[in-house]
C-alpha cells in the first residue's frame, strides 16, 4: 500500500547496530515481535476500545499462530518502522509497505500479502484523473508512494503533505485541497465509515503496487518461516477468510 521514501543511509546505520534474532532464537523465546503503525485503517489501527485491529493485525496473528508463537505487537510511527526493524526492535514488520527496488536494498521482503494501488479521491464533480489534477492542490501522507506519485503528475499546482491520512481527508472535506491520493482500500473504508458516499467520489488509480512484510536484511531464517506460513494460510483458506472479513473480497496478488 505505502512505500515510504526511506533514506538508505539511515537504514544502513540501523544495520550497523542490528541485533536481530534468527528464527531459532525466536522459537526458543516463544514470542515473535511484530512492528506496525496502528494508524492505517482498515489495515492496522486502534479501535474505539484502543485495541489494535485490522486486516494486517488479523493476518499477523494468524501467521504467529501458524508458527506456534505468541505475537507481541509494537506500534510505531510509520517512517521509523524499517529503521527500528534493522535495529532489532521487531522480528518483522507488517504495515502496508510496498515493495520497491530502493527499499529492497536495505530490508528483505516476503512474498506479497496483498496487492493494491493509489487512487484519486475528490468531492463529487471534482478531479478524477491525473489530467484533471492540473492546476489543483493534492493532499498525501508524508513519506509515502502517494506523495512520490503526486509529485510526478504533470501540472499539479501543489502537493500538500500530512502526517496521517485522516488529516488529508479532513482538508478535502473542508475544501483546503482539491484531491487526496491514498490507498484504494483506505479510501473505500473512509467513505463507508464516515457515510460520505454522497459527498466523495473515487477516481482512477495513479499506480498499482505489491505489498509485503519486511524482515531485517539477510535474516533468511525469519524470511523463509514467514513465507511458508503465509503460503500455508493462503492454501488452507485462512487468508481468504480474513481478507473477505475486511474487504469483502480476496486481495491476494493474482
What are these regions (language model features)?
Residues 61, 65, 70-132, 198, ...:
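Acidic, polar ligand-binding/catalytic clefts
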Residues 114-121, 184, 188-231, 249-254:
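Periplasmic-binding protein-like
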Residues 20-96, 236:
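Extracytoplasmic small-molecule ligand-binding "clamshell" domains
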Residues 72-83, 125, 142-145, 160-174, ...:
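Short helix-initiation/N-cap motifs at beta->coil->alpha
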Residues 97-105, 149-152, 173, 178-208:
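A ligand-binding cleft/hinge motif common to bilobed small-molecule-binding domains
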Residues 20-22, 145-162, 198-203, 228-254:
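Ligand-binding clefts/hinges and TM-proximal coupling segments of bilobed small-molecule sensing domains
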Residues 33-41, 52-65, 116-167, 184-186, ...:
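Bilobed "Venus flytrap"/periplasmic-binding protein-like clamshell domains
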Residues 58-66, 136-137, 142-145, 210-249:
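Extended ligand-binding regions for polar small-molecule ligands
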Amino acid at each position: 500500500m505505502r512505500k515510504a521514501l526511506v533514506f538508505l543511509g539511515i537504514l544502513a546505520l540501523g544495520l550497523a547496530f542490528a541485533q536481530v534474532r534468527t528464527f531459532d532464537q525466536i522459537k526458543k523465546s516463544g514470542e515473535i515481535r511484530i512492528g506496525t503503525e496502528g494508524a492505517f485503517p482498515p489495515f492496522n489501527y486502534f479501535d474505539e476500545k484502543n485495541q489494535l485491529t485490522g486486516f494486517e493485525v488479523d493476518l499477523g496473528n494468524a501467521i504467529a499462530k501458524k508458527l506456534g508463537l505468541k505475537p507481541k505487537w509494537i506500534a510505531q510511527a510509520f517512517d521509523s518502522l524499517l529503521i527500528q526493524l534493522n535495529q532489532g526492535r521487531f522480528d518483522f514488520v507488517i504495515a502496508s509497505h510496498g515493495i520497491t527496488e530502493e527499499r529492497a536494498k536495505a530490508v528483505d521482503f516476503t512474498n506479497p500479502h496483498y496487492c493494491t494501488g493509489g487512487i484519486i479521491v475528490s468531492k463529487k464533480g471534482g478531479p478524477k484523473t491525473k489530467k484533471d489534477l492540473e492546476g489543483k492542490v493534492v493532499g498525501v501522507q508524508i513519506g509515502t508512494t502517494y506523495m512520490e506519485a503526486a509529485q510526478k503528475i504533470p501540472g499539479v499546482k501543489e502537493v500538500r503533505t500530512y502526517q496521517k491520512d485522516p488529516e488529508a481527508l479532513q482538508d478535502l472535506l473542508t475544501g483546503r485541497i482539491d484531491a487526496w491520493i491514498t490507498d484504494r482500500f483506505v479510501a473505500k473504508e473512509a467513505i463507508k465509515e464516515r457515510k460520505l458516499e454522497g459527498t466523495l467520489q473515487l477516481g482512477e488509480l495513479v499506480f498499482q503496487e505489491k505489498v509485503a512484510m519486511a524482515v531485517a536484511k539477510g535474516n533468511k531464517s525469519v524470511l523463509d518461516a514467514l513465507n511458508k506460513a503465509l503460503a500455508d494460510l493462503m492454501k488452507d483458506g485462512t487468508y481468504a477468510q480474513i481478507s473477505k472479513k475486511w474487504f469483502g473480497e480476496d486481495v491476494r496478488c493474482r
